[in-house]
């Protein structure tokens, strides 16, 4: 959670400055020098000077009141085995476009430091890798800096790393897409910002802005390019977040340079020449089996066997486990059926920037949300079915 919950009067005065008492002094001088001044002018002056500071008071009281409301449930980190030195570990990122992090690295049980740090600690400890990056601040736009609080990454180091890599991954992909970089770059940054704010939602944190992504995109590309040219190789076994961040940045840069995105395992495709039709065809081809006469005969049987296998995997899960839903999601993520993978296809359309079909960015994001919600409903029904089976 953002450090803004500790926002007090002192920090408010440090940020906005103390209320000046010059209006009172000016009023006394006016009384001495001009005794015959009308009382209406005095009242008008005092009201004007106080209202200016009162507005700041109202802002402080209202914003601290909102910020002090704690979320009902703590934010959980989805645990997933990701070894940044292994390209296959990026399957989860490449299929959902969000990074989930695992506390265990390789075979060691080294727990990463998840203590709460200040935003400045995060900026200095994790992100300074030699390139002139500014990943921990807000936009360079002065108007935004004056009017809004600064955007902060999560204070949880694990979650913070996931957030940064997710945004960099999206930004690099869209930056290397011809349609994104030449035709509608502003929409690209806005799309990343809106999707990020939906996935990593925190009540007391200022949403990330498209301006912030735009201002830092060049630095991210430069950072990955420099590390790539140096032949930088890190050791992920140490559990050092800085090294993992460097490894991941190189991997993301190489993936973006190739201009490809993998949906599932070992299914690369070019963004510029790929749409939803080719994705659906790829899934259909992977499930289709032909017999000696050249007819598709066993597709239904394969689907039935696969569903039975998935069902058996889910039945082995512990219903009382608090991570039951996450474990079910891991099982379902391996299914290639269109009804369960539809949300991946929709997100892929966003990445390929197919913006000319009359749909706006918001409408496409709404489609993503609806599909994800539908998947969650399916999981709920599966759990109810399992409860019924166990009771029998």
Curated annotation (Swiss-Prot):
Biased composition (Polar residues): 287-296
Phosphoserine sites (modified residues): 11, 139
Region (Disordered): 18-52, 284-303
Recorded GO CC terms: cytoplasm; nucleus
UniProt keyword terms in alphabetical order: Cytoplasm, Nucleus, Phosphoprotein
Chain intervals with Basic and acidic residues compositional bias: 21-31
Residue ranges, compositional bias (Basic residues): 41-50
UniProt subcellular location: Cytoplasm; Nucleus
Single GO biological process annotation from the record: nucleobase-containing compound metabolic process
Misc note: Present with 538 molecules/cell in log phase SD medium.
Protein name listed in UniProt: Protein SRL2
Lineage per the UniProt record: Eukaryota, Fungi, Dikarya, Ascomycota, Saccharomycotina
Gene: SRL2
